[in-house]
């Protein structure tokens, strides 16, 4: 759980938010606040409470309509955690040990805990409990959807056809958003652009975005222009051609 920035919601905010906004009128859409997942990195209950509130406000401010979307808090659905346990007794250790996200998070300084190690199992329960068919994720979360499919298939093989096998929806463009310094946008690099930052801060950050040495009037290469890469995230094809 974190305030919206151009990069992140768990992995990528745009990766979840844009598809959710676009799909909410055509599909049965479920969005949840992952407060149990957040416990792997947040221990202060007051901080967690504020993050939950902020995340809900972010969803609503960006265009999520509660009349079209089922928006809920993970901890309010006890069945998710029951299912997580049922899946855990079927999950081979080797399956979890192969998950690169655990190793990445440990390398970034998070404590090596069972909760962090078994994160993919709770994520599988999140997905399977609502019978999701499409799951918007980043490339770094694709493996977790594959774990979900493996666990669902194993459960179905033992107990019958209970769970639907979900498919990941991956936006390749969003997985590599450039930060204001030209590197991959990341809070650890301190190069993010917060959606709800003040105009003054946004103005300063935008002016710091790394560009080439060409004059404003010169023709730019859209594939290597950082400004255009950000513009593409919030524009349609016609606007990009213009």
Regions found by a protein language model. Give the residues of each.
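Active-site cores that bind ATP or allylic diphosphates and position pyrophosphate for catalysis
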Residues: 103-242
């Amino acid at each position: 759980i974190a305030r919206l920035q151009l990069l992140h919601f768990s992995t990528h905010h745009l990766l979840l938010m844009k598809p959710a906004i676009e799909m909410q009128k055509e599909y049965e859409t479920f969005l949840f606040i992952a407060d149990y997942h957040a416990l792997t990195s947040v221990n202060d209950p007051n901080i967690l409470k504020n993050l939950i509130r902020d995340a809900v406000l972010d969803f609503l401010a960006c265009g999520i309509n509660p009349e079209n979307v089922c928006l809920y808090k993970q901890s309010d659905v006890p069945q998710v955690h029951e299912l997580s346990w049922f899946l855990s007794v079927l999950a081979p250790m080797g399956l979890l040990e192969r998950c690169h996200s655990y190793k990445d998070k440990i390398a970034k300084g998070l404590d090596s805990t069972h909760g962090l190690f078994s994160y993919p199992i709770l994520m599988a329960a999140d997905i399977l409990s609502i019978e999701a068919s499409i799951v918007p994720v980043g490339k770094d979360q694709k493996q977790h959807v594959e774990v979900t499919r493996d666990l669902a298939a194993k459960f179905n093989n033992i107990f019958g056809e209970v769970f639907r096998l979900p498919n990941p929806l991956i936006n390749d463009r969003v997985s590599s958003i450039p930060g204001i310094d030209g590197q991959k946008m990341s809070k650890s690099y301190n190069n993010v652009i917060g959606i709800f930052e003040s105009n003054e801060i946004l103005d300063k950050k935008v002016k710091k975005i790394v560009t080439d040495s060409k004059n404003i009037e010169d023709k730019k290469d859209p594939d290597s222009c950082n400004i255009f890469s950000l513009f593409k995230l919030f524009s349609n094809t016609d606007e990009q051609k213009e």
